[in-house]
């Protein structure tokens, strides 16, 4: 991929070690489908004749950094490339992990694809309000799931997204 820099974050090795130790099939699926998600972005980017600046592997999976695409329609194609992969795999495999990744990534919360799409097409103030509302609902739902004994994952994701948004303000 030419001049694309590959960055391996130490946390990527931590999550691989944890996944191997935990022997959790769902965790491996999510890691694999997250990589395929990013490959969807990469495919869309390359199809438009653009090149990523950086490919980063970290605790959160794989992330692409690229220069801003010159027009909103092509940027939309790049942003939707990842969720489209999860949607296709969800439909074809009837796999709940892909369904969850698709739905999560389409939420209008920055830095998720849905949040970036909202920022691209909606007025800034509306994007901020929409993101805050969805994040509040997601956090409340995560707290409820934890209270009912369903696990900490949703609450953890929503708190991470909340911190990401606070950092960007």
Annotate each language-model stretch with its function.
Residues 1-169:
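Hydrophobic transmembrane alpha-helices and their immediate loop junctions
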């Amino acid at each position: 991929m030419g001049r694309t820099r590959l960055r391996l974050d130490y946390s990527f090795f931590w999550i691989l070690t944890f996944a191997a130790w935990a022997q959790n099939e769902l965790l491996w699926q999510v890691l694999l489908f997250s990589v395929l998600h990013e490959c969807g972005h990469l495919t869309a980017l390359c199809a438009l004749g653009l090149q990523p600046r950086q490919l980063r592997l970290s605790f959160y999976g794989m992330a692409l950094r690229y220069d801003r695409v010159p027009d909103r329609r092509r940027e939309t194609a790049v942003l939707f490339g990842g969720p489209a992969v999860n949607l296709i795999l969800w439909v074809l495999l009837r796999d709940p992990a892909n369904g969850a990744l698709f739905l999560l990534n389409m939420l209008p919360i920055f830095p998720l694809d849905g949040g970036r799409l909202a920022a691209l097409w909606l007025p800034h103030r509306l994007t901020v309000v929409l993101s805050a509302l969805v994040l509040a609902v997601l956090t409340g739902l995560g707290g409820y799931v934890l209270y009912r004994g369903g696990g900490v994952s949703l609450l953890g994701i929503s708190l991470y997204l909340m911190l990401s948004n606070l950092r960007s303000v």
